[in-house]
């Protein structure tokens, strides 16, 4: 998100660190990717010293602060009782937090904690962080970006983090008492309505099948690319 221009960024639930690599390419000088010990170090998109193994259901403490903390589509994979722990870890790391998590009915593999946006908004508010709905309007029509990022991403900022925010972001502050609502196209909203009626096992099976298809397509494209060379 170019308006923020952070120089230090931490990502909780980073996977291989792909987002951190993108922030680095965008000008961030110091990044830290944090995820479980299961992440294959040989597949990291960042340097090994830029990765930290941690259990996200437990407090993550790095002993330092960052210009920006982020967690994108991670909260839905953690038990509901770990929701406040995740937010605690994020707010401990920065005055500004870029956050998204799957909403109710989104569906996905290993989703155990899909919640309305207001669920997370309330947890951040208890920590003194206000929602700024600056990301969704900027991305909503960009179909090159996955819908869960376009429709779920919210910037949370505390009083200290307000200092230096561009006026374009300040103008998007969600008024006190106003709950965040789902965004998205008609098709996306219909998907949410349908999926939330399905048993979790069915949703997981669909998500796994879709992941297999996408993986096969990716491998096929890679093979064709090599053949062309």
Residue ranges and their predicted role:
Residues 129-140:
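Conserved S-adenosyl-L-methionine
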């Amino acid at each position: 998100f170019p308006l923020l221009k952070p120089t230090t960024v931490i990502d909780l639930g980073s996977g291989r660190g792909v987002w951190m690599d993108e922030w680095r390419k965008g000008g961030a000088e110091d990044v830290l990717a944090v995820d479980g010990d299961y992440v294959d170090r040989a597949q990291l998109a960042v340097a090994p010293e830029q990765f930290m193994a941690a259990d996200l259901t437990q407090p993550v403490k790095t002993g330092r602060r960052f210009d920006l903390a982020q967690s994108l589509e991670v909260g839905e994979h953690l038990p509901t009782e770990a929701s406040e722990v995740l937010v605690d870890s994020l707010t401990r790391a920065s005055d500004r937090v870029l956050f998204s998590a799957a909403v109710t009915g989104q569906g996905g593999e290993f989703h155990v904690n899909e919640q309305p946006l207001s669920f997370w908004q309330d947890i951040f508010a208890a920590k003194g962080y206000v929602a700024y709905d600056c990301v969704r309007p900027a991305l909503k029509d960009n179909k090159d970006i996955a819908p869960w990022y376009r429709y779920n991403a919210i910037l949370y900022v505390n009083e200290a983090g307000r200092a230096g925010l561009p006026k374009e972001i300040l103008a998007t502050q969600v008024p006190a008492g106003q709950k965040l609502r789902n965004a998205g196209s008609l098709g996306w909203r219909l998907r949410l309505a349908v999926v939330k009626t399905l048993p979790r096992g069915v949703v997981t099976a669909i998500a796994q099948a879709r992941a297999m298809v996408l993986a096969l397509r990716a491998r096929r494209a890679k093979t064709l690319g090599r053949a062309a060379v």
